[in-house]
């Protein structure tokens, strides 16, 4: 196959977050089932149990059309939060977490875990000590502090998609953060709470994430080919 077209995904500041590559299809071959069954039946009925069979292959064209696929690709949701008050370490953790989420494909029926995508948060793996909640009661500096802002940003993006996304696991913070409305956060800990979601649609979804270090804003985007039926979802907090 050869690349037919590239669809570029950009953040509001114009930064290229990722690219979706569309490949031209090529014809394949399919065994003519009726002809094969006929040959088997004839050989069996004639008592020729060692008969040689001729395979009749028929050329088959791709079911989909690349141009149709490109035309149906659209942004399903996006959400952003600001981390302007974060220090350098926390900001770098936010940037690293967004980078690990960027360009992730979610196949139909597939389930993804935020903890599995990011992996263990240790200084050896490049995570910097920054404020994080310890024991549900206080803030302490811990490697990876700040990644819950990215998981919360992603959680809101997923909610905006509607029923095509199923939230499998999500927990709120014991101490509410200021970057999202109360009740719309998603806390994570590598050996504890996790944000887990699955694709309930019949086609893949594409996740992109980006941290703008100039404006101190983290973005999450989800793209897919689900038909636009005019339904749009809003989320709010009622506390």
Task: State each model region's role.
Residues 2-239:
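Well-ordered beta-sheet/strand-loop patches within structured domains
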């Amino acid at each position: 196959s050869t690349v037919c077209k590239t669809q570029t995904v950009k953040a509001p500041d114009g930064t290229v977050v990722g690219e979706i590559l569309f490949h031209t299809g090529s014809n394949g071959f399919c065994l003519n089932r009726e002809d094969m069954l006929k040959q088997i039946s004839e050989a069996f009925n004639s008592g020729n149990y060692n008969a040689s069979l001729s395979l009749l292959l028929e050329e088959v064209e791709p079911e989909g059309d690349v141009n149709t696929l490109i035309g149906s690709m659209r942004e399903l949701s996006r959400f952003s939060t600001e981390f302007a008050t974060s220090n350098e370490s926390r900001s770098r953790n936010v940037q690293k977490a967004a980078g690990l989420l960027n360009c992730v494909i979610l196949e139909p029926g597939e389930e993804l875990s935020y903890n599995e995508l990011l992996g263990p948060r240790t200084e050896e793996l490049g995570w910097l000590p920054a404020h994080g909640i310890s024991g549900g009661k206080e803030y302490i500096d811990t490697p990876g502090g700040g990644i819950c802002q990215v998981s919360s940003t992603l959680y809101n993006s997923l909610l905006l998609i509607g029923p095509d996304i199923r939230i499998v696991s999500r927990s709120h913070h014991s101490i509410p953060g200021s970057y999202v409305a109360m009740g719309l956060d998603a806390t994570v800990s590598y050996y504890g709470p996790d944000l887990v979601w699955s694709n309930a649609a019949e086609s893949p979804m594409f996740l992109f994430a980006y941290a703008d270090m100039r404006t101190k804003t983290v973005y999450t985007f989800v793209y897919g080919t689900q038909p636009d039926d005019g339904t749009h979802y809003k989320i709010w907090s009622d506390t």
